[in-house]
Design a protein with these regions (language model features):
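Alpha-helical heptad-repeat coiled-coil segments that mediate oligomerization/polymerization in large
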Residues: 256, 419, 426, 464-465
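Terminal intrinsically disordered/low-complexity segments used for targeting and assembly
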Residues: 2-9, 16-111, 170, 194, ...
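A short glycine-centered flexible hinge/capping loop motif at secondary-structure junctions
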Residues: 250-254, 458-462, 499-503
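Periplasmic alpha-helical coiled-coil/stalk elements that build and connect Gram-negative outer-membrane
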Residues: 60, 186, 195, 202-318, ...
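Small/polar-residue-enriched beta-strand and adjacent coil segments characteristic
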Residues: 34, 51, 60, 72-75, ...
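Hydrophobic, well-ordered secondary-structure elements that form the walls
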Residues: 356, 384, 401, 408, ...
Length: 514
């Protein structure tokens, strides 16, 4: 019997009307479902709250408190996280130190260090998760084929035609489904995944800055020890000369054996200092080699000097734009964004899950009829899932996500305070070391002047060589102190560059540390 167009219209209109009615009821029930009230959110601190002049605006809202404000709060966090778009400092910020050997080591480290490979792997994992989340938002289409040979029991509910007989059966079916995202579930899930992906991306930059800073610190420390060793070698020669002079004076009856023994005791002490410096230098060479992705003994011949290293003037103004470029702060901000979206996602679980499903295929008992016109099988309609009674599971999940958002906000606030402290410490140390260097330069000049005067008196026959050696002792002590202050100044410069995320854009007034 052929169906008329009117009959077909009536046949499909009835179930579609029922489906619309069910869908409307689901939306009504979903609108009545309440996730309850959440505790007040933690405030997200801004750079101005820690005493820095801000050039960007940061949000003070941590997470959503109602479904109507979820997207607004997430957008605010997104703008907060958009400070990540502030350009990072010069990628090769360590070049400001002016040592080509250090540049080579850092560049090798950034290409071969396993710790960076781990950060890149975490980024790849987050990217894959984002791709997977995106893939679930479109139509899902599948194709299945089931073939079986079955003997039907004689004592079951099968009709006599089947009972006790063996038949082949086949089912070839294509199916499709599409989730209707009326409540922002897909968007929240995608934004949460994107937040984690962006955090992982920025953490790669943070790992690069940290690696370069650690390598620069070790390099400066090694250069300091090399300088101190050179001074110690000169002290050894000077004390040997002092011992020789003392022995001669004892033989001449001008000094006692006590002075000779004192001079003899200074030699082993100086040699022990040199051995200690050699041991520390070996450890630093091993550290530099491993940081640059090499075997520990690869840099056993490395002996850098403080002379070529340069110290740059600090920025006149450290604003929020500088502090906000720190990769770890940017990553923490993205973690907050992801956590906020997780809260929004947990809230959507209270609303209906509505899908459109459909299938078309062939099904028959007996493979010889599988592809006949009468074996066709098709269907379509909505599928709805609505949580009604779950023992508080969804509310617990929502509160857990809200707590995780608070944890992310707290972690960001702690990181911001730590960053501000690191910058403040570096700035204060910079000024203190600069004042110490000025005073030490005067002390060194005075010691060198006294040494020159003692030498002139000795050459003029007005003084003895013992006075020259004694004056040189003060000069060597001041040179050791100068090396210490030089390395402290360079170390502090690296610390400030790392604290600001890798330097600053201001054109530095570069001066030698010598």
């Amino acid at each position: 019997m052929n169906s008329t167009p009117t009959a077909l219209l009536i046949r499909w209109a009835v179930p579609l009307t029922a489906a619309v009615a069910v869908l409307s009821a689901a939306l009504l029930l979903g609108g009545c479902a309440s996730p309850g009230q959440l505790p007040p959110p933690l405030p997200l601190r801004s750079a101005t709250s820690v005493g820095w002049l801000a050039s960007t605006t940061a949000s003070t809202t941590a997470r959503t408190t109602a479904s109507t404000t979820a997207s607004t709060t997430a957008s605010t966090a997104s703008s907060n996280a958009s400070e990540a778009t502030t350009p990072f400092p010069e990628p090769q910020w360590w070049r400001a130190l002016g040592d080509p050997a250090l540049d080579t080591l850092v560049e090798r480290a950034l290409s071969d260090q396993p710790s960076l490979a781990a950060a890149a792997a975490r980024l790849a994992r987050a990217t894959a998760a984002t791709t997977g989340t995106q893939a679930t938002q479109g139509p899902q289409v599948g194709l299945g084929l089931d073939l079986s040979r079955q003997r039907y029991t004689e004592h079951g509910l099968y009709p006599p035609l089947l009972a006790g007989r063996v038949y082949n059966s086949g089912n070839l079916q294509a199916s499709a489904s599409l989730e209707l995202d009326f409540f922002g579930r897909h968007g929240a899930a995608l934004q949460a995944a994107l937040g984690q992906q962006q955090a992982a991306r920025v953490e790669v930059q943070a790992a690069r800055v940290l690696l370069a800073a650690n390598l620069a610190h070790a390099y400066v420390s090694l250069a300091r020890l090399v300088s101190l060793r050179e001074i110690s070698l000169r002290q050894l020669d000077q004390r040997q000369a002092l011992l020789d002079l003392t022995v001669a004076r004892v033989q001449a009856g001008l000094d006692t054996v006590m002075e000779q023994r004192q001079a003899e005791g200074s030699l082993p002490d100086t040699r022990a200092q040199i051995e200690a410096l050699d041991g520390q230098m070996a450890l630093l060479r091993h550290q530099l080699a491993v940081l640059s992705g090499q075997a520990p003994q690869a840099l056993d011949g490395l002996s850098p000097s403080l002379a070529p290293l340069r110290s740059a003037a600090p920025p006149e103004r450290i604003g929020a734009d500088l502090l906000g470029r720190r990769a770890d702060l940017v990553a923490a901000r993205w973690r907050v964004e992801a956590a906020l979206q997780d809260v929004a996602l947990a809230r959507t679980q209270f609303y209906p899950d509505i899908n459109l499903i459909g299938f078309v295929g062939l099904n028959s008992l007996g493979l010889d009829r599988l592809f006949s016109i009468g074996s066709r099988n098709l269907g379509a309609g909505p599928a709805l899932r609505l949580p009604l009674f779950d023992g508080g599971r969804l509310r617990a999940n929502l509160r857990g996500r809200a707590a995780e958002a608070d944890l992310a906000v707290a972690a960001y606030n702690v990181a911001l305070l730590d960053a501000a402290r690191e910058v403040a410490d570096a700035a204060a140390t910079w000024a203190s070391v600069a004042r110490q260097q000025d005073q030490q330069a005067r002390a060194l000049a005075a010691a060198e002047s006294a040494h020159d005067a003692a030498g002139q008196r000795y050459r003029a026959g007005l003084g003895n060589y013992l006075a020259v050696l004694s004056a040189e002792t003060a000069v060597l002590a001041q040179r050791s102190q100068r090396a210490d202050l030089q390395s402290r100044a360079l170390d502090n410069q690296v610390a400030l560059m790392r604290a600001l995320g890798g330097g600053w854009h201001d054109e530095p007034a570069v001066r030698s540390v010598r």
